[in-house]
A protein has these predicted regions:
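A structural motif
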Residues: 28, 103-106, 140, 164
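Short, acidic/polar
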Residues: 12-24, 83-101, 151-154, 176-177
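Active-site groove signature of glycoside hydrolases
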Residues: 98-119
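Beta/alpha (TIM)-barrel catalytic core signal, keyed to glycine-rich beta->alpha loops juxtaposed to Asp/Glu
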Residues: 13, 113-272
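N-terminal binding-site loop/beta-alpha segment at the start of enzyme catalytic domains
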Residues: 1-62, 66, 130, 200
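Structural motif corresponding to the early beta-alpha repeats
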Residues: 60-87, 112
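Acidic (Asp/Glu)-rich catalytic clusters
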Residues: 22-25, 46-63, 98-104, 135, ...
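Active-site mouth loops of central-metabolism enzymes
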Residues: 3-15, 76-88, 116-121
Length: 272
């Protein structure tokens, strides 16, 4: 299953269960989370999945993605023993995620972010090796990485035994919508997931040409940005907590921008 739109669950806290159920009720079939209690409530996603299963929404109908978060991304709530070797940390976090999510497999498992910048470190390679093992054992259909730069991704593509199948990055219009990383993804058949498409780009939502596109399509500027992302080859994430916005966001699947409109936004015309 390759999703066209993903519901993100960061910062939902105690509302996570009800929001995930609302998102699936609205029509989302892909859920993104992380085993990072500082920002995510992964176990509450699992509670939602349990409730949904009882109502006939099968696990097989959903794309489920979570992440291994390195120690620097945690507060004092760490889902693994940080004194263990990195491969064991990944294994503990992965098994904890399966338990939280009431599943025996993931559709996608990501490294939440590299251990070092601008290149990859020995720690990154050790963790990637652990993700490869999980993929080979059938625990995750795809493996990938989030918050990655062009150098890191190109190195991973060139040298990894199991190539990344997913990249998830924040997208800024004034930085070309992460063009360099997206080009690597396109050339290598990697699913590019874009997050913060709205919150990182408020000027785009107010830009008169984008507002005019929304008027032409009978939607709002937010849906134009999501549709642009789809037509530019991204799989967008939304983390809205508003049930009406969930339904509105999904309308992006029903509209079509012209190639000229896509190019206009992608090449900076959508940025005032």
């Amino acid at each position: 299953m390759t999703p066209s739109f993903i519901y993100g669950t960061a910062w939902k806290k105690d509302a996570t269960t009800e929001l995930v159920k609302a998102a699936v009720g609205a029509g989302f079939r892909a859920i993104d989370t992380a085993n990072q209690p500082k920002h995510y409530s992964e176990a509450l996603v699992g509670e939602a999945l349990k409730d949904l299963a009882a109502k006939g929404v099968s696990r097989d109908s959903l794309f489920l993605q979570t992440k291994f978060t390195p120690i620097d991304g945690h507060d004092n709530r760490v889902p693994y023993d940080p004194q263990l070797p990195l491969k064991e940390q990944v294994r503990q976090s992965f098994e904890s995620s399966l338990q939280h999510l009431n599943t025996d497999r993931l559709d996608s498992y990501l490294l939440h972010g590299p251990y070092s910048y601008p290149g990859l470190s020995d720690a990154d390679w050790e963790v990637w090796g652990a993700l490869e093992d999980i993929h080979r054992s059938g625990g995750a259909g795809r493996i990938g990485i989030s918050n990655v730069n062009q150098l890191q991704l190109s190195t991973l593509v060139q040298k990894a035994s199991v190539k990344p199948a997913v990249v998830q990055n924040r997208c800024y219009a004034n930085r070309g919508w992460d063009r360099e990383v997206r080009e690597i993804c396109k050339a290598n058949g990697i699913m590019y997931q874009g997050f913060s498409l709205l919150t990182a780009n408020p000027p785009v939502l107010r830009h008169p040409p984008v507002v005019a596109m929304a008027r032409r399509c009978g939607v709002n500027p937010e849906q134009i940005v999501f549709r642009f992302a789809m037509q530019a080859g991204m799989t967008p994430l939304t983390g809205t907590t508003d049930a009406r916005h969930m339904q509105e966001d999904l309308k992006a699947l029903e509209i079509e921008l012209t190639p000229e409109e896509v190019k206009f936004i992608e090449t900076g015309g959508g940025t005032p």
